[in-house]
Amino acid sequence: MAGLRSYIFIDQLQPKTMCYLGTFCRGFLPRANLAALVIEVAPGLDIEPLTDIAVKSVDVKPGILVVERQFGYLEFHSHSTASVKAAGDAILAELGASAKDAMRPEVLASKIVKRIDNYHALLINRNKLGSMILPSESLFVLEMQPAAYAILAANEAEKAANVKIVDYRMMGATGRVYLSGEESNIRAAARAAEQALELRMAA
């Protein structure tokens, strides 16, 4: 039986978070403000029959289906919040689980770096696929497990403040988020991202 690591409902995908998703999305590309659900399970191959259930139960579009070394990931979305929730409910029924059975996030690192140096900005930009961080901007970095919570943190941070999505990694052993912008906006975004995870920790 698959173990439910992450079950993340997103009420509205924010534009920058959605665009970054497009850098590694191999399925149907989402649009801004769509509802979405991200599911992470172990072992990884168990995500395949769960995907079958989701796409056959209601009209949702799968954007990501990845089986990696240990875990499997599925993201699907729709203009209809009800359809996304119904597909999620069908998956939970198959697992004999509830959303509360998903693992709670654990924050491993959370740091703000003020006024990034030219060389530091260059090194970050060489390894990222999102917006470029500029010298003198502030940088927020966040690491958590399970990894899928990275998309929730990025999305909630973008709702709260005008920041750039430099990078987020939502698959693998840990998730990571890189955000940049003016220091005041970065601090607001950091609070929003941390609070989103804290709410899941307390659930």
Language-model-derived ranges and their functions:
Residues M1-V41, L45-E48, S57, D101-S131, ...:
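Intrinsically disordered, low-complexity polar/charged tails and linkers
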Residues F28-A32, I64-R69, S131-L134, E158-K159, ...:
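Solvent-exposed alpha-helices and their adjacent loops that cap or buttress functional pockets
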Residues N33-A42, F71-H79, E137-E143, T174-E182:
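Short glycine-rich or small-residue beta-strand-to-loop segments that form or flank ligand, phosphate
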Residues G44-D59, A148-A161:
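Short amphipathic alpha-helix segments
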Residues V60-E68, A99-S110, V163-M171, M201-A203:
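Flexible, glycine/charged-enriched surface loops at secondary-structure junctions
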Residues L74-S110:
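Hydrophobic, ordered structural segments
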Residues A82-G96, N185-R200:
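Charge-rich, low-aromatic oligomerization/scaffolding segments with amphipathic character
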Residues L122-V166, E182:
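Surface-exposed interaction/gating patches
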